[in-house]
């Protein structure tokens, strides 16, 4: 799989009372991101706790990252769309060869970036605030976006698009407000390079859609902060699932600092363009199940049908019927036909 991460120090961890309090706040907000003043108050409170005072200062971004990561996890559990596989039906991740061929990245669709107004979407009036969640006119579905911050190179959910501008040189830019941040954190972002459709948190059964060579959004935990960065999957170690869910491990290389780390599936968000793999795999599983159902009745019918050997010189007689000629005439040696089974000498 590769070497383990080495970032010079232990990763920051929240203690149990802090996690319990943040989970209660997230529940009160119906899994929505709390306001900045709430997160800053939590950071100050945790820093002044007896366990941390004078030792570790909890930063606002660490609080924000925890809420963001937990919201991703809850969204992955709650949004179970049709066509996704059930872990209980696939206890082992050793897929048959025909299924492996289905999910090979032969023709992966290109990453969906925002290029001005997306197809099927109506441009907003000038000066109005455009939400970061938009409805696509093609299939009446919602599109959510994420943007890459120039301050730290990490990706954040877009709460709203505030304005746009066309530069004389270079690509157009859009001013975004990141989810959970206030106006002072607004940024002008390159539309073509750093705005795209939001990455998808992975359910336990979706590890089969994460393959070596994929671009993923990976949660990197450092000594002072934990952020979502682009990464390339270098290798995947498939393991048997259990009651805890997916136990597979993935070796990734982060694009911003070229560091490598072995991560579980819960830290990976896959790109939306990999949805076709899950759909193809789902279709393959259904086809296999249907073929097995057709084979079982055929086997039952074959067991009830009298056996007839083509070219056989001796007819097969039912046990209950008796032919007087068989007992009256001496047995004659019958040469087996070309289709009859032969018994090797010495096997009796």
Curated annotation (Swiss-Prot):
MF-aspect GO terms: chromatin binding; DNA binding
Specify residue ranges for compositional bias: Polar residues. Answer: 324-341
Which keywords accompany this UniProt record?
Answer: Nucleus
Spans annotated as SAWADEE domain:
154-260
Keyword Cell membrane recorded: no
Q: Where in the cell is it found?
A: Nucleus
Write out the GO cellular component annotations.
nucleus
Pfam families recorded: SAWADEE (PF16719)
- Which stretches of sequence are listed as region Disordered? 318-348
Query: What InterPro entries is this protein classified in?
Result: HD (IPR001356), Homeodomain-like_sf (IPR009057), SAWADEE_dom (IPR032001), SHH1/2 (IPR039276)
Q: Does the keyword Ubl conjugation apply?
A: no
Please state what the annotation says regarding this protein's domains: The SAWADEE domain (154-257) binds to mono-, di-, or trimethylated H3K9 histone peptides, but this interaction is blocked if H3K4 methylation is present.
Q: What does it do? A: May play a role in the recruitment of Pol IV to genomic regions associated with K9 methylated histone H3 that are targets for RdDM.
Q: What is this protein called?
A: Protein SAWADEE HOMEODOMAIN HOMOLOG 2
Organism, scientific name: Arabidopsis thaliana (Mouse-ear cress)
Query: What's the encoding gene here?
Result: SHH2
């Amino acid at each position: 799989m590769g070497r383990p991460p080495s970032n010079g120090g232990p990763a920051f961890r929240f203690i149990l009372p802090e996690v319990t309090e943040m989970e209660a706040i997230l529940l009160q907000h119906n899994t929505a991101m709390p306001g900045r003043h709430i997160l800053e108050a939590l950071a100050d409170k945790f820093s002044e706790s007896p366990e941390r005072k004078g030792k570790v200062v909890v930063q606002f971004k660490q609080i924000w990252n925890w809420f963001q990561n937990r919201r991703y996890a809850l969204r992955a559990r709650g949004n179970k769309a049709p066509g996704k596989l059930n872990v209980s039906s696939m206890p082992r991740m050793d897929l048959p060869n025909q299924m492996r061929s289905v999910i090979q990245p032969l023709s992966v669709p290109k990453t969906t970036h925002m290029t001005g107004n997306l197809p099927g979407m109506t441009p907003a009036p000038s000066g109005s605030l455009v939400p970061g969640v938009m409805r696509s006119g093609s299939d009446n579905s919602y599109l959510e976006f994420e943007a890459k911050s120039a301050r730290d190179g990490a990706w954040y959910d877009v709460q709203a698009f505030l304005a746009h501008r066309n530069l004389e040189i270079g690509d157009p830019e859009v001013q975004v407000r990141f989810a959970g941040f206030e106006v002072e954190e607004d940024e002008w972002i390159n539309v073509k390079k750093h705005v795209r459709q939001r990455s998808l948190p992975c359910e336990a059964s979706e590890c089969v859609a994460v393959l070596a060579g994929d671009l993923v959004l990976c949660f990197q935990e450092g000594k002072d902060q934990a952020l979502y960065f682009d990464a390339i999957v270098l290798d995947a170690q498939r393991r048997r699932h259990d009651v805890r869910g997916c136990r597979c491990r993935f070796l990734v290389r982060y694009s911003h600092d070229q560091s490598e780390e072995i991560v579980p599936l819960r830290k990976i968000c896959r790109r939306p363009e990999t949805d076709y793999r899950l759909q193809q795999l789902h279709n393959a599983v259904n086809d296999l199940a249907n073929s097995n159902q057709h084979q079982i009745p055929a086997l039952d019918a074959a067991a009830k049908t009298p056996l007839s050997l083509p070219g056989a010189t001796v007819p097969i007689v039912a046990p209950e019927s008796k032919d007087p000629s068989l007992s009256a005439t001496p047995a004659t040696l019958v040469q087996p036909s070309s289709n009859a089974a032969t018994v090797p000498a010495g096997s009796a």
